[in-house]
Amino acid sequence: MSTSLNYKSFSKEQQTMDNLEKQLICPICLEMFTKPVVILPCQHNLCRKCASDIFQASNPYLPTRGGTTVASGGRFRCPSCRHEVVLDRHGVYGLQRNLLVENIIDIYKQESTRPEKKLDQPMCEEHEEERINIYCLNCEVPTCSLCKVFGAHKDCQVAPLTHVFQRQKSELSDGIAVLVGSNDRVQGVISQLEDTCKTIEECCRKQKQDLCEKFDHLYGILEERKTEMTQAITRTQEEKLEHVRTLIRKYSDHLENVSKLVESGIQFMDEPEMAVFLQNAKTLLQKIVEASKAFQMEKLEQGYEIMSNFTVNLNREEKIIREIDFSREEEEEEDAGEIDEEGEGEDAVEVEEAENVQIASSGEEESLEKAAEPSQLPAELQVAPEPLPASSPEPFSSMPPAADVLVTQGEVVPIGSQQTTQSETSGPSAAETADPLFYPSWYKGQSRKTSSNPPCTHGSEGLGQIGPLGIEDSSVQSAEVAEAATNEQAAVSGKESSSTAATSQIGFEAPSPQGQSAALGSGGGADPEPARHVFSFSWLNSLNE
């Protein structure tokens, strides 16, 4: 207890001496005042030597002798408060000495040179003659042996001071080391945070610069577009103004001519001589009639001057601009992942479809080889192909919708031969009631005969599907065509010319004139044999080859 008090008193005395030393420092030489010490009128103190140096520096042109100013009088400023000090004829020697400060300096020097008192071993407060030599572990205070034997610590555990001293000293040293290490780590974290601040500032500066550049680019685009649209309005304005001004000039010239004509007519009305009047009246009347009939006023369209076609609606663009925001990398990565997954799924579906097509095509090739022979038409129904007329401009799309066909490797089969529905079995088909120009006879006959067959499972899949059904029916078609050709109505012959022109562009070939005349000759009488329309698709077969 007494040791701590002594230590506190010693530290307090040392602090007092340090504060006193600060008050005894000269503001010029920054050292302790040297006697004699003079006091200025502003109550600040200076060494006389320092005051003389300031005076000489302020008055450099005054004569000196032995380093001192000879002339009397002068002035200088206080170095502490800049107050002007006026000297009398004695100069700096006329300033009063501060004896109090000189005495304090002497006392301070004596105390500072006195040897330090050695602190003796502290004594026990209860037993003044006993030294503190043990440490109470329970109370955690140093004490003496008598306190352990008879005093307040007789029931406590004690230990020698040296053991406790070494232990606490090591603990204190370890604690200091931990604090030092912690301070180093904190300092490292502070350095990292400072670097992070610099990085943040640099990155933000770059992002701001990039953002400004992008917005400047947008500004440039808007300005460019604004200039282009303004120029378009200006061009239209000039064109319309030129047109209107042309009309103004035209009407002005006409008005001027009519005014002159009216003026001359009024003057001619005052002619007193009837003979002269009648001689010139016809010519004047003719001019008036021509002027009234020849001139036609051109009226401008309604809203010609409004320029409503240049109205701009920027609501959508304004909404888009207001929704401009920073892009998020996480959302972009998720979108990219979803797109990749969708692409992989589509690739897998395409691979499966390609495999199925390969398998189907392999089976179809075998069936095509077997059914290639019976697909030929009878020789009596085949007609030599004639070249298409070069002057027919009708496109391929002029083909009648009922003439859709199914293309296979060996031949071309009409779709109607593969598609059978419930309506065909219950009543007359649409091909029977339709115009024969759009539906050939063999197509109607085949639809009637094949209505009892089971419906095709793959015939409704659309044009271009290849299957064995088209090949199996090809042999039946040859006989059906021959039978259906004899059942054509007489109305077909009346529309033969238009049907031939409509179908000549897409591969339908009509019989030649020689064949028609032969058919008429063989039929004889008033009931000639109806013309036969044969479909030739040899040019499609050549494409497959």
From Swiss-Prot:
Tissue-level expression reads: Widely expressed in various tissues, besides skeletal muscle and heart, such as brain, lung, liver, spleen and kidney.
Compartment(s) where it occurs, according to its Swiss-Prot or TrEMBL record = Nucleus; Cytoplasm
Source organism (scientific name): Mus musculus (Mouse)
Which intervals carry biased composition (Low complexity)? 474-485
UniProt protein name: Tripartite motif-containing 55
Zn-finger segments (RING-type): 26-82
Give the GO molecular function terms: identical protein binding; protein-macromolecule adaptor activity; ubiquitin protein ligase activity; zinc ion binding
Please give an example of a GO cellular component term from this record.
Answer: cytoplasm
Q: Organism's domain of life?
A: Eukaryota
Zinc finger regions, B box-type: 119-161
Lineage of producing organism: Eukaryota, Metazoa, Chordata, Craniata, Vertebrata
EC number, UniProt record: 2.3.2.27
Q: Which gene encodes it?
A: Trim55
Q: Give the InterPro entries listed for this entry.
A: COS_domain (IPR017903), E3_ligase_FN3/SPRY (IPR050617), Znf-RING_euk (IPR027370), Znf_B-box (IPR000315), Znf_RING (IPR001841), Znf_RING/FYVE/PHD (IPR013083), Znf_RING_CS (IPR017907)
Its biological purpose is as follows: E3 ubiquitin ligase that plays an important role in regulating cardiac development and contractility, muscle growth, metabolism, and fiber-type differentiation. Acts as a critical factor that regulates cardiomyocyte size during development in concert with TRIM63 by regulating E2F1-mediated gene expression. Plays a role in apoptosis induction in cardiomyocytes by promoting ubiquitination of the DUSP1 phosphatase. Promotes non-canonical NF-kappa-B signaling and B-cell-mediated immune responses by mediating NFKB2 'Lys-48'-linked ubiquitination and processing.
